[in-house]
Amino acid sequence: MIQKEGCFVMKIQAVLIDGFKNLSNVKISFDNITALVALNNFGKSNVLAGIDFGLTFIKAKMEDKPDMMSNSNLIPINCFMFGRNYKFEMEVLTELASKEYRVLYGYEFAWKCDENAKPQIVSEYLRIKLEDKGQKYTQLINRNVQRALYKSSETGRCSSKINVESTELVVNKLRAYDELFYAEIIKKLNSMRFYME
């Protein structure tokens, strides 16, 4: 959750992590109090480190991202998971223009598993919906290996092309687009902090 002058700005509802150390498709839903309980060496610390890594990667400078994507201490070495991409997804609640929205943001990148491999972001998406019953998600970012698209106006589609480097996130590039109707959400995603006790 991000706090700003005593009011809640963004609250994490759920996180999904895959392809980080020994973690495979771990999804955690958060309540007001959430506890991770397991025997020693079952990956509790890896879950917390995976969340921290996912948020740190979003905020990292573009020149630091390739090093993060090449960190051999974080690449899965389990024989069933070796070479698996890192995937991070978070679901958050936030306010925009006095309305509550559910935001789904995620990305996936290929680790640099050997000297010949090139780390690259292979997928990224941002979807929002009003937190009312029966509402559907609206796609704001849609990226794959071939192209990156974003929604440039409230009435249009997610079809505007944007040029990004292979290790650059669209959500980082869109910080410079102040005229977007969802610019506040982009700024919040780029400045998230995660506190654990």
Where are these regions (language model features)?
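N-terminal pre-Walker A segment at the start of P-loop NTPase domains
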Residues: 2-24
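Extracellular/lumenal ectodomain signal focusing on beta-strand-rich modules
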Residues: 14, 32, 50, 123-125, ...
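Phosphate-binding P-loop
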Residues: 25-31
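The conserved Walker
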Residues: 40
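Conserved P-loop NTP-binding catalytic core
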Residues: 49-115
